[in-house]
Amino acid sequence: LHYYKHGGFGQIKLREPMILGHEVSGFISKIGSNVENLLVGQLVSVSPSRPCNKCNFCLSGNQIQCINMKFYGSAMPFPHIQGAFREILIVEDYQCVSADGLSSEEAAMAEPLAVCLHAIKQADKIFGQKVLITGSGPIGTLCVAAARRAGAEEIIVTDISTNALTFSDS
């Protein structure tokens, strides 16, 4: 939303036209010859993270720690990395997770929800505790849901936008 509304965030500014989007799901239309466990027509959530497979972390099998990770819809490098909000997107099989039983909208929320679930895991003992969530945009709102699910006794949400707070409160 920051790219769309403000042309960037902080020091990161758009310097060329860029397709937005890193929250993505889609139906598989074609599969490569070596791909297993995915089917044409299947709905998948797509991870926006693409490791370099060249740094020390990647070479040791720890791609999640890649120091050159590329993310769909990022203006950090130049040229920018185009986003996933398009009709056709070619992805690697490791980026796809079956979203059977979900709508495409729900499947697209897998990445932001994963951010929130990771935060809950890092916080450790949430059950019965007071939790502060700073910012009630899409991620903050999902964090409210995750904190509720984890059994937080009280959830306090802050934001500079009254509209965002009202939405988070519901």
What are these regions (language model features)?
Residues 115, 139, 147:
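Hydrophobic/small residue at the entry helix of a nucleotide-binding pocket
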Residues 9-59, 100-102:
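Glycine-rich beta-strand-centered segment in the early N-terminal region that forms part
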Residues 39-40, 92, 127, 151:
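Residue-level preference for short coil/turn positions at secondary-structure junctions
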Residues 2-7:
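Short Gly/aromatic-enriched secondary-structure transition segments
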Residues 54-134:
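NAD(P)H dinucleotide-binding glycine-rich loop of Rossmann-like/cofactor-binding domains
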